[in-house]
């Protein structure tokens, strides 16, 4: 499986690997698969388990390795495991985390329209 994702180390070092597979059907299956993946990762985080979603670089090889038959297809590979060092998400601001990940700052891609009142 590691040879079929963009970051093989995230799979090789994982204690558990989950491959989310979808079947065509009604609704937004890719959207639902993303929500399922996010739910698994958030549940793991709540229990002290880290995770890393991986994009699939060779879908055909992954399908062969796992005997996934069309029309089913894998959409994401998630590695789960124990943190390699203590977690401290508050050691950086959201802006610092975004910069470290080489992502655009939120204020450059988010537009706030009006005020939200609760």
Predicted regions and their residues:
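Acidic, surface-exposed loops and disordered segments
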Residues: 1-118
